[in-house]
Amino acid sequence: MEKIIEIQDIVKNYQIGSVIVRALRSVSVDIRKNEYVAIMGPSGSGKSTLMNLLGCLDTPTSGTYILNGTDVSKMEDDYLAEIRNKEIGFVFQTFNLLPRYTALENVMLPLIYAGVGKVERERMAIEALEKVGLSDRMDHKPNELSGGQRQRVAIARALVNKPSIILADEPTGNLDSKTSIDIMGLLNDIHSNGNTVILVTHEEDIAKYAARIIRLFDGEISQDVLNKDFSYN
């Protein structure tokens, strides 16, 4: 399968006062199209930094990041924003929904940024909400939805632009165990439909849903293994 992510010798340093924090130390990893990967690690391991780089929310201090054939390592913010909107669908722990907007309006937002016309973006947003089982909640605002329903809206928003990658950061962190299982089942379905899914988590039970598990420790990859319990649907 063709590579969608190629990271080579990535270093990320932060300067805090007079101290240099080495968040990532020469990290190299490839991810192929339609892979389902979990990135794990304790607090301070560098997993959040790696997620920010993978999501084009930040750029490395040094090293190379090729995303779907494009070198994004040294891109300026405006270009990174275009790449993000085109290539990556984000699912966050805190949902990041706008409280005054309905579910449908929240899902349409990436399409507005992409310049999609009103009729077409409404059609695409309705289709995305139907895929996550929320066809009867489109006109509800976030405070009228359960936590699981809010996360489904967030997943619909992530899918609506038909991105190359779904990047899920602790997607079940604010959910109870039953709702977490439902949401992970939905991510499994998304992967089965051909999407590349990258899951950032500290929970072993959640990481087991992925086909491959990458563990970070002190800014380095300490383990990169296939999940023997993973089964393709």
Can you describe what each PLM-predicted range is?
Residues 2-216:
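ABC family nucleotide-binding domain
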